[in-house]
Curated annotation (Swiss-Prot):
Record GO terms (molecular function): lipoyl(octanoyl) transferase activity
One Pfam family recorded for the sequence: LplA-B_cat
Species lineage: Bacteria, Pseudomonadati, Pseudomonadota, Alphaproteobacteria, Rhodobacterales
Ranges of residues in domain BPL/LPL catalytic: 29-217
The name this protein goes by in its record: Octanoyltransferase
UniProt pathway: Protein modification; protein lipoylation via endogenous pathway; protein N(6)-(lipoyl)lysine from octanoyl-[acyl-carrier-protein]: step 1/2
Alphabetic keyword roster: Acyltransferase, Cytoplasm, Transferase
Other facts: In the reaction, the free carboxyl group of octanoic acid is attached via an amide linkage to the epsilon-amino group of a specific lysine residue of lipoyl domains of lipoate-dependent enzymes.
Length: 220
């Protein structure tokens, strides 16, 4: 498996072309699986379920059609984007399990920083409860999204992946309704008061990956 960390900001079109080529190579047995960690310049992406009404400021940043699952999301500096190109044909062919493992990977990574990430029924991604914010009118803790997940499969090879908010400009999310959810906000590790660097997150991601996914099964 190739584990790649790109410096600088990678244009979205370049990343998409690289993913497309790598997915084809993996499916044809010409290349190993790949995990690609990068940052994008500020942009919005629209998944296959995106509602145009959720793009509330269409002129703010470039908007790209992503052809992944999900709705609108934001990518930009300070956010760790992780493109996950795994051969699910050799890992069980279970899409639901794959998405659950993506969530579990993020949750384990956050736990390295003593942050409790949680799943929520009907809301893909990873959420944190905000003890530091006023409770809702119903007396419940507010919840903010810290990581988004959106994937696609081609010939049982995954691509696209996840993003974790490390230290992005959270105001940049205001041009969309993130993931179509209006009643919850977004947060980041730094917003939660943690002096975490991108390099710290990268180390935690790699440590937790094999614990969550395991190595590629060896064919007999």
């Amino acid at each position: 498996m190739d584990w790649i960390i790109s410096d600088g900001l990678v244009p979205y079109e370049d990343a998409l072309a690289t993913m497309e080529a790598r997915v084809a190579a993996i499916s044809e047995g010409r290349a190993p699986e790949m995990i690609w960690l990068l940052e994008h310049p500020p942009l919005y992406t629209a998944g296959t379920s995106a509602d145009p009404a959720d793009l509330t400021d269409p002129d703010r940043f470039p908007v790209h059609t992503a052809r992944r699952g999900g709705q609108y999301t934001y990518h930009g500096p300070g956010q760790r984007v992780v493109y996950v190109m795994l051969d699910l044909g050799k890992r069980g062919r279970d899409v639901r399990q794959f998405v659950c493992r993506m969530e579990a990977w993020v949750i384990a990574t956050l736990a390295e920083f003593n942050v409790t990430g949680e799943r929520r029924e009907g809301r893909v991604g990873v959420w944190v409860q905000r003890q530091d914010k006023p409770r809702t009118a119903a007396g419940q803790l507010q919840e903010d999204k810290i990581a988004a997940i959106g994937v696609r499969l081609r010939k049982w090879v995954s691509f696209h992946g996840l993003s974790i908010n490390v230290e992005p400009d959270l105001d940049h999310f205001s041009g969309i309704v993130p993931c179509g959810i209006t009643e919850h906000g977004v947060t980041s590790l730094v917003d939660l008061g943690l002096p975490v660097t991108m390099a710290d997150v990268d180390v935690a991601l790699r440590k937790c990956f094999e614990e969550t996914f395991g190595p590629l099964p060896v064919e007999a």
